[in-house]
Every structure is written in C-alpha cells, then in structure tokens.
Amino acid sequence: MIKVTLTALLLALTLTASLGAARLNPEAHYQEIAAKKYSGQTEVTMPDGTRCDIVTETHAIEVDFADKWAEAIGQSLNYSFQLNKKAGILLILESIKDEKHLIRVQSIIKHFKLTIDVLAIRAWE
C-alpha cells in the first residue's frame, strides 16, 4: 500500500512540475529568431564543452526564459570570457508579468557595473 501511494505521489509531482514548466515555445525557437536577426550562429561549443546559445561577431549571448535571469548572468559571463567577446543576455518574456525579471537583471547589472548587454523578446508581440 505504501509503495502504491509513493508511486502515485511521485507521478502527481512529476505531472505538476511538467505542467508548471510549460512554455509558449521552446527556447530554441527564440534562439533561431534572434540568431537570424543578429547574424549569429547557434549552439556553439565552447572550449570547456559548454554551448553558447548564440555567437555573433561581437557577442556571446545566453538565451533564457525570464525566470532564469540569474543563471543567464553567469552563463553569459562564462561564454564572454571563453570567446573574448562581449557578454549578452536575451531574455524571453512570455507575459507582461515577466517584465519584473527584466527590470531585476538590468538593475543588478547596472548596480555591479557588469558589462553585459541585455535584450528581450516579448513573445506576445
């Protein structure tokens, strides 16, 4: 009985987590749009084996959903360091509520005088 209950609980948690992670489009959709717009190459393998979402002539850009802004800061700086290019973040805003994340990342970058350029894609536009 306990085994069945635990299995049901795990299944319910898994389904709930996957429903909460639902996105309007996958990250790759926005990467492709931005790569075309900025003449960049997608999924470029770095010397350390990680992959930068978009590399342009001047920037190494991390593309991420707005609620992952904190991870985007670190990743963009890592890619920038490895390629000796400017760091960039492209935040995907799926609703007007995501604007708060854009404001937060811009404020932190300004406060700490980080050299990261921030762009946003508003999925509803």
Question: Where are the predicted features?
Answer:
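Bacterial N-terminal signal peptides that target proteins for export
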Residues: 1-6
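Bacterial N-terminal signal peptides
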Residues: 7-16
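Acidic-basic catalytic patches of nuclease active cores, encompassing PD-(D/E)XK
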Residues: 16-57
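Active-site phosphate/pyrophosphate- and oxyanion-stabilizing loops and adjacent acidic/basic residues
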Residues: 32, 77, 106
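Short, flexible loop segments at the rims of nucleotide/cofactor-binding pockets, characterized by
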Residues: 39-41, 64-67
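Conserved catalytic cores of phosphodiester-cleaving nucleases, focusing on short active-site segments
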Residues: 54-65, 79
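Nucleic-acid nuclease catalytic cores
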Residues: 65-70, 80-125
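Short, surface-exposed coil-to-beta transition loops
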Residues: 71-75
